[in-house]
A protein has these predicted regions:
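A transmembrane-helix-recognition feature enriched in membrane-embedded lipid enzymes
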Residues: 1-28, 34, 52, 60, ...
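A charged, well-structured terminal subsegment
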Residues: 100-108, 171-203
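Catalytic-site beta-strand/loop segments enriched in glycine and acidic/polar residues
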Residues: 105-133
């Protein structure tokens, strides 16, 4: 699909990161398929996670199509940008159209970004995962790449006044090994296993994080 909007938005986002002084650390980008469909299952700790995770995929020249809530698409400024970047509109009261759109994107060879916790974790721990990412992976026949973002919560997260002052905030994006699923996989069991993988990855990221506190 044509990407006329994504590149200029990326340029603006990179400028924003530079202004904030973000110090990025990308790990495991070799685990992102260079071609073909895949799902990034991303933890959710800040309002910046989608842009942070998308930035992490740029070194391998993949644009991520994020599943984002309808309210963002309804915004007069954000909406046209999201549609222009071919992100996927999620209406929580009617999820079928977004599922079909994500499935179509995956079968067309796109990378789809999903936050399986469905909301920001205010404890910064991995919440219970919704099953949608697993079901999509099975139906589309694509792998899930567990993805951990960390650091954005220090700038903008749920329930805390954002702090957009310039600084030197370490921000990391870690991509785990792709997980492939059989057609007859038990979704509930696989979801719990994916959560455990993400918990383990998050613990490792926190241990290596340059600051002593986790939040």
């Amino acid at each position: 699909m044509a990407d006329l909007v994504y590149p200029p938005v990326i340029a603006v986002v990179k400028g924003f990161w530079k202004y904030l002084g973000f110090q990025f650390d990308f790990q495991g980008d070799e685990n992102i398929p260079r071609k073909g469909g895949a799902i990034l299952a991303i933890n959710h700790v800040s309002y910046l996670d989608f842009a942070i995770a998308g930035t992490g995929a740029l070194p391998v020249k993949r644009f991520v199509r994020f599943m984002a809530k309808k309210e963002l698409f309804d915004h007069k400024i954000a909406g046209p940008l999201l549609r222009g970047m071919h992100h996927i509109n999620v209406d929580r009261n009617n999820g079928a159209p977004s599922y079909v759109a994500a499935l179509k994107a995956l079968k067309a060879g796109e990378i789809v970004g999903i936050f399986p916790e469905a909301t920001i974790s205010t404890s910064f721990e991995i919440k219970q995962l919704k099953s949608g990412a697993l079901r999509l992976a099975v139906d589309a026949g694509v792998p899930i790449v567990p993805t951990i973002v960390w650091g954005g919560q220090r700038v903008s997260t749920k329930g805390i006044k954002p702090n957009f002052k310039r600084g030197k905030t370490p921000v990391s994006v870690t991509f785990g090994e792709p997980i492939h699923y059989a057609k007859d996989v038990d979704i509930e069991t696989a979801s719990q296993q994916l959560r455990q993988v993400m918990i383990s990855m998050l613990n490792q990221v926190q241990e290596k994080y340059p600051d002593s506190h986790v939040g």
